[in-house]
Amino acid sequence: MATYLIGDVHGCYDELIALLHKVEFTPGKDTLWLTGDLVARGPGSLDVLRYVKSLGDSVRLVLGNHDLHLLAVFAGISRNKPKDRLTPLLEAPDADELLNWLRRQPLLQIDEEKKLVMAHAGITPQWDLQTAKECARDVEAVLSSDSYPFFLDAMYGDMPNNWSPELRGLGRLRFITNAFTRMRFCFPNGQLDMYSKESPEEAPAPLKPWFAIPGPVAEEYSIAFGHWASLEGKGTPEGIYALDTGCCWGGTLTCLRWEDKQYFVQPSNRHKDLGEGEAVAS
């Protein structure tokens, strides 16, 4: 029984299957954790969703910003951009089933026995774990309700960017969504910066990567995240695992076997012929 953590798949179905074959992943015996952004940019978003859904209890995933953007496109709120290569998924006969399943997936995964937490972008240092749990449930409840299109229409935006327990309504939900799915840099007090996408070495002062600012969750738990391909899986403190290594940009798909902390990589099948960018500013 092994636990495998894999970074952002982004529609790279062939690489995902090859990587799982490489590690001899066995559904029903092993567990697969996925950092989100299952879809967009790669050619196989439809196949990725079908496969991941078929794994049932053998998979634990979190939603990423591209997954939320797909839901917004499906709801008629956002435009389907050709570069995201989502049309086969949106036009599939089982699109309703797949996307209604997707919107019921969590923003946060926690394994208390392993002392392991996963979120797509990470955990803001302004939150303790109880706050993170409550905030995740707030957005998950709206996404799984009939009013989810209203939330998806309001989720786009960069403010508010500072956490307060007094936040209410759509502002609260937008902050939570940004913290879980778009965060990279923070100010020293933990306030989110939603504009900088550089590598940590190139970021303007006083910005720091979220994981470089002490927070209560990282004191007690390991944190696995994706989202930040330009990190190339490097430069994080002990106990912080950056797993997005840019497969859809011509990099690799990375897997971490949790029990012995061994890494496995699968090279991308694609040439790096696209400039890096995102369907949702992240």
Curated annotation (Swiss-Prot):
Gene3D superfamilies registered for this protein in UniProt: 3.60.21.10
An example Gene Ontology molecular-function term: bis(5'-nucleosyl)-tetraphosphatase (symmetrical) activity
Keyword field: Hydrolase
Taxonomy, superkingdom: Bacteria
InterPro entries reported in the protein's UniProt record: ApaH, Calcineurin-like_PHP_ApaH, Metallo-depent_PP-like
SUPFAM superfamilies from the UniProt entry: Metallo-dependent phosphatases
EC number, UniProt record: 3.6.1.41
Function noted in UniProt: Hydrolyzes diadenosine 5',5'''-P1,P4-tetraphosphate to yield ADP.
Family, as annotated: Belongs to the Ap4A hydrolase family.
This protein's name: Bis(5'-nucleosyl)-tetraphosphatase, symmetrical
Organism annotation: Escherichia fergusonii (strain ATCC 35469 / DSM 13698 / CCUG 18766 / IAM 14443 / JCM 21226 / LMG 7866 / NBRC 102419 / NCTC 12128 / CDC 0568-73)
Taxonomic classification: Bacteria, Pseudomonadati, Pseudomonadota, Gammaproteobacteria, Enterobacterales
